[in-house]
Amino acid sequence: RAQDWELNFRLRENGGLVYFDPRLHVTYRPRSTVRALAKQYFEYGRWRRVVSRRHSGTINYRYLAPPFALVGFSLSLIAGIFLPILFTPAAIYLLFVVLASIKIATSIREYLLLLAVIPTMHFAWGAGFISSPKTLVPAAE
């Protein structure tokens, strides 16, 4: 529930240093379905908004990119119905997804999965961030 972001903020605020050590070995278990991935990223977005409300110094453009991408993509699709040139931002986003998938994938299967995974991560995170209610607070409070 965004504990890592909040801990990093509190460490830095108190003069601590947060860094990555490449010698660390971690085990990551990816979600088994796109739906489970969407749920995970929706929750990430919701809780990131909670941290940004409590600690305004933790928010930056990188964290605002998914909500802006979601809103921009959606508006582009709606506006494009009335003026086709306005489909352009959505088309550019999709082009970036295709190019990123080509660059990252090591097989056709991975490429096809990435075409679904990348927008799922962006849009679910953005939707969670946008829809996060002000009443959402960590359980300990």
Task: Pin down the residues of each PLM region.
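Intrinsically disordered, low-complexity N-terminal regions enriched in serine/proline/glycine
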Residues: 43-46, 62, 92, 110
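Short, flexible loop/turn segments with low-complexity composition
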Residues: 62, 140-141
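Select subsegments of transmembrane alpha-helices in polytopic membrane proteins
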Residues: 59-67
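Catalytic donor/gating beta->alpha subdomain of glycosyltransferases that bind UDP-sugars
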Residues: 1-59
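Membrane-embedded multi-pass helical conduit in multi-pass membrane proteins
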Residues: 68-139
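Hydrophobic transmembrane-helix microenvironments that flank and shape a buried ionizable site
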Residues: 1-3, 63, 119
